[in-house]
């Protein structure tokens, strides 16, 4: 038996014994996902099946929810012959993912129940092992909602609008009617208002089934847009009057999707 054949047998044996393996061409999706999760929770439990990777959790105050769907076909390489859950401290996971360079491929795998391996490769190969944690947190149910308004806009303009509104208020009111998507905020200091329509380059599409108006916390929205926006240039915003808002980010062209739900603020008017 030559050495090459021997090493191939070892590699095949490891692949067979492996509980889970997911390889992506870059770390941008992992950075966006982990940063988005960090805005809501300190611990995260990922569910891996042969269909892909999912994560869903609600913040402690139960006003916001993040929902990740990362199908197996969206990875460069993916293996999961039986369901596998792994729980990590989000801050620790971010530290490791943050060690990657822009052109690194990322491989996350596990051959044992209590740890995962994180590998970065781009000529310079690095491997980190992070021990898994035990957590009692379960997966949050996904809200079943139908929305009256759906807008597709650039991440840049949405973040800019939120920053403008936050200059005078910690709440932003979204209103849609007659082909216009409006944002406003007010406080004892004063008022701020921004209006977008499809004549501009920033609002890519707007569908309004019925006039919609609802108010949300600016900080929650800003945090998730900054986090997920690391890997997404555009976002979909859906809402209805006095109902939660849903933001959806497509993190790659193969179907990796990050959703975010935020409950409305109760108006004092």
PLM features: what roles do these ranges have?
Residues 172:
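Polyanion-binding surfaces on beta-sheet-dominated domains and ring/shell assemblies
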Residues 2-38, 43-167, 175-269:
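DNA polymerase sliding clamps and clamp-related checkpoint/processivity subunits
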């Amino acid at each position: 038996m030559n050495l090459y054949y021997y090493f191939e047998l070892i590699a095949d044996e490891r692949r067979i014994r492996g509980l889970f393996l997911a390889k992506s061409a870059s770390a941008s999706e992992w950075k966006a996902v982990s940063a988005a999760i960090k805005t809501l929770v300190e611990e995260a439990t990922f569910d891996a099946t042969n269909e892909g990777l999912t994560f869903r959790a609600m913040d402690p105050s139960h006003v916001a929810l993040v929902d990740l769907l990362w199908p197996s076909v969206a990875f460069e390489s993916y293996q999961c012959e039986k369901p596998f859950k792994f729980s990590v401290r989000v801050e620790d996971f971010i530290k490791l993912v943050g060690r990657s360079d822009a052109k690194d491929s990322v491989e996350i795998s596990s051959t044992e129940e209590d740890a995962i391996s994180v590998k970065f490769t781009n000529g310079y190969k690095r491997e980190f092992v992070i021990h898994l944690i035990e957590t009692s947190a379960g997966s949050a149910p996904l809200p079943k909602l139908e929305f009256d308004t759906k807008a597709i806009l650039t991440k840049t303009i949405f973040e800019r609008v939120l920053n403008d509104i936050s200059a005078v208020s910690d709440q932003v009111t979204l209103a849609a009617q007659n082909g216009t998507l409006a944002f406003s905020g007010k406080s004892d200091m004063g008022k701020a208002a921004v209006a977008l329509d499809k004549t501009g380059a920033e609002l890519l599409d707007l569908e309004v089934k019925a006039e919609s108006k609802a108010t949300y916390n600016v900080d929650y929205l800003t945090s998730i847009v900054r986090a997920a926006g690391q890997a997404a240039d555009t976002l979909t915003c859906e809402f209805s009057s006095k109902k939660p808002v849903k933001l959806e980010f497509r993190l790659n062209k193969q179907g990796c999707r990050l959703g975010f739900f935020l409950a409305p603020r109760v108006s004092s008017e």
